[in-house]
């Protein structure tokens, strides 16, 4: 027979002893709580990269990219401050083919206009590098980087440095020989990496916008089919951006200014004249514009198919994300057609390039929603 216990009996001895706090738990919690601060810093970088892409486009459209003929990452931060400094820079520019074959007779004032565009473009690159360095090393020293994110954030700095080197590699292609502009394939490399960096930052911002545990739970209900569709859209959009850079690099947008045909035919004229034949895909204005058109049509068709598939999703936010993808793809096609019909003036051209930025971001957002759906209640409120 068991021994009776008083209802007033002390029970403290029967309770389990409290476990000691594990070292580092508070530190890990603080680092997890820093996701918001890191996210704000990434938003700053995102905005700067968007501006950088726009300034880079305007630098190209104003034919300013070859106005600075030296690569001085540190000393170049200080612009010419005296008449002697300006005379030296102008003399360097007058020694390259662009001046001798295209801009001979340019005044100092005209040179200063294009110089400031290129200097501003490079200076903005320095600002982006500084913002990255201050943020990354500041978070690193104060141990505010969320677990698992040090390598990802460091990668952004590495890619930024690589982008600067590619930028000079691009400029160097137009300083010798008979080149009047930078090599179009180098321009495509430079712009392509800029969009890759932008997309990476955008993805990081979205991931840090939700707690890690929420992401792990949401991934269980992810929609693999829509993720695959978004991957196809990302790939096609990347190809289209590179083709757009080739179009811009050789002014192919002004070669054929009719639509839907090209000089009255489906195919451009004399499209295989260059030797070896592969050069036509990069240097023949007609073929480059034709390829840009065809991939644009394909991107829209695939986008509409993926949008149609997204109608079956049980998640409202996922469907809305793909709605916006369909809208921007259609809008970009219309904007591209208007740009061609107007012989690619700088206003329409820069708007079309900005549309590409929005397109990439909306496709990434749709992919994120498909991979990490947001659950909603029956009333439509986010759960």
Curated annotation (Swiss-Prot):
<feature type="transmembrane region" description="Helical">
    <location>
        <begin position="230"/>
        <end position="250"/>
    </location>
</feature>
<comment type="subunit">
    <text>Interacts with CtaB.</text>
</comment>
<comment type="pathway">
    <text>Porphyrin-containing compound metabolism; heme A biosynthesis; heme A from heme O: step 1/1.</text>
</comment>
<keyword id="KW-0479">Metal-binding</keyword>
<comment type="similarity">
    <text>Belongs to the COX15/CtaA family. Type 2 subfamily.</text>
</comment>
<keyword id="KW-0408">Iron</keyword>
<feature type="transmembrane region" description="Helical">
    <location>
        <begin position="187"/>
        <end position="207"/>
    </location>
</feature>
<protein>
    <recommendedName>
        <fullName>Heme A synthase</fullName>
        <ecNumber>1.17.99.9</ecNumber>
    </recommendedName>
</protein>
<dbReference type="GO" id="GO:0016653">
    <property type="term" value="F:oxidoreductase activity, acting on NAD(P)H, heme protein as acceptor"/>
</dbReference>
<dbReference type="GO" id="GO:0046872">
    <property type="term" value="F:metal ion binding"/>
</dbReference>
<feature type="binding site" description="axial binding residue">
    <location>
        <position position="292"/>
    </location>
    <ligand>
        <name>heme</name>
    </ligand>
</feature>
<feature type="transmembrane region" description="Helical">
    <location>
        <begin position="153"/>
        <end position="173"/>
    </location>
</feature>
<keyword id="KW-1133">Transmembrane helix</keyword>
<feature type="transmembrane region" description="Helical">
    <location>
        <begin position="38"/>
        <end position="58"/>
    </location>
</feature>
<keyword id="KW-0472">Membrane</keyword>
<dbReference type="InterPro" id="IPR003780">
    <property type="entry name" value="COX15/CtaA_fam"/>
</dbReference>
<feature type="transmembrane region" description="Helical">
    <location>
        <begin position="287"/>
        <end position="307"/>
    </location>
</feature>
<dbReference type="Pfam" id="PF02628">
    <property type="entry name" value="COX15-CtaA"/>
</dbReference>
<keyword id="KW-0350">Heme biosynthesis</keyword>
<comment type="function">
    <text>Catalyzes the conversion of heme O to heme A by two successive hydroxylations of the methyl group at C8. The first hydroxylation forms heme I, the second hydroxylation results in an unstable dihydroxymethyl group, which spontaneously dehydrates, resulting in the formyl group of heme A.</text>
</comment>
<dbReference type="InterPro" id="IPR054616">
    <property type="entry name" value="HemA_synt_rhodobact"/>
</dbReference>
<dbReference type="GO" id="GO:0006784">
    <property type="term" value="P:heme A biosynthetic process"/>
</dbReference>
<keyword id="KW-1003">Cell membrane</keyword>
<dbReference type="InterPro" id="IPR023754">
    <property type="entry name" value="HemeA_Synthase_type2"/>
</dbReference>
<feature type="transmembrane region" description="Helical">
    <location>
        <begin position="344"/>
        <end position="364"/>
    </location>
</feature>
<feature type="transmembrane region" description="Helical">
    <location>
        <begin position="321"/>
        <end position="341"/>
    </location>
</feature>
<feature type="transmembrane region" description="Helical">
    <location>
        <begin position="127"/>
        <end position="147"/>
    </location>
</feature>
<keyword id="KW-0812">Transmembrane</keyword>
<dbReference type="GO" id="GO:0005886">
    <property type="term" value="C:plasma membrane"/>
</dbReference>
<keyword id="KW-0560">Oxidoreductase</keyword>
<feature type="binding site" description="axial binding residue">
    <location>
        <position position="352"/>
    </location>
    <ligand>
        <name>heme</name>
    </ligand>
</feature>
């Amino acid at each position: 027979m068991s021994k009776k216990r008083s209802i007033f009996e002390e029970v403290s001895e029967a309770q389990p002893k409290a476990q000691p706090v594990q070292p580092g738990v508070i530190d890990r919690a603080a680092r997890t709580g820093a996701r918001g601060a890191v996210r704000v810093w990434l938003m700053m970088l995102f905005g700067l990269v968007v501006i950088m892409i726009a300034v880079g486009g305007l630098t190209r459209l104003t034919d300013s990219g070859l106005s600075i003929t030296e690569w001085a990452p540190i000393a170049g931060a200080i612009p010419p401050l005296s008449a002697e400094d300006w005379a030296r820079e102008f003399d360097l520019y007058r020694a390259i083919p662009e001046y001798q074959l295209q801009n001979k007779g340019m005044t100092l004032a005209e040179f200063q206009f294009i110089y400031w565009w290129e200097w501003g473009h490079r200076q903005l690159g320095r600002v982006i590098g500084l913002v990255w360095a201050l943020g990354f090393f500041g978070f690193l020293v104060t141990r505010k980087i969320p677990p698992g994110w040090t390598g990802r954030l460091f990668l952004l700095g590495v890619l930024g440095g690589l982008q600067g080197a590619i930028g000079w590699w691009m400029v160097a292609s137009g300083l010798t020989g008979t080149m009047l502009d930078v090599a179009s394939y180098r321009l495509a490399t430079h712009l392509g990496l800029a969009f890759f960096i932008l997309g990476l930052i955008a993805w990081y911002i979205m991931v840090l916008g939700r707690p890690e545990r929420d992401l792990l739970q949401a991934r269980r209900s992810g929609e693999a089919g829509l993720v695959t569709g978004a991957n196809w859209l990302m790939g096609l959009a990347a190809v289209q951006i590179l083709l757009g850079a080739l179009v811009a690099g050789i002014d192919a947008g002004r070669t054929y200014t009719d639509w839907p045909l090209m000089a009255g035919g489906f195919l451009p004229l004399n499209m295989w004249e260059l030797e070896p034949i592969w050069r036509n895909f990069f240097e023949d204005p007609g073929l480059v514009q034709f390829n840009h058109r065809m991939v644009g049509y394909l991107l829209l068709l695939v986008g509409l198919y993926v949008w149609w598939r997204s109608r079956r999703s049980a998640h409202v936010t996922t469907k809305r994300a793909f709605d916006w993808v369909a809208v921007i793809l259609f809008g970009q096609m219309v904007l591209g057609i208007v740009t061609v019909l107007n012989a690619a003036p700088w206003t329409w051209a820069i708007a079309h390039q900005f549309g590409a930025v929005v397109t990439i971001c909306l496709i990434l957002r749709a992919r994120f929603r498909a991979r990490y759906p947001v659950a909603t209640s029956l009333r439509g409120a986010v759960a």
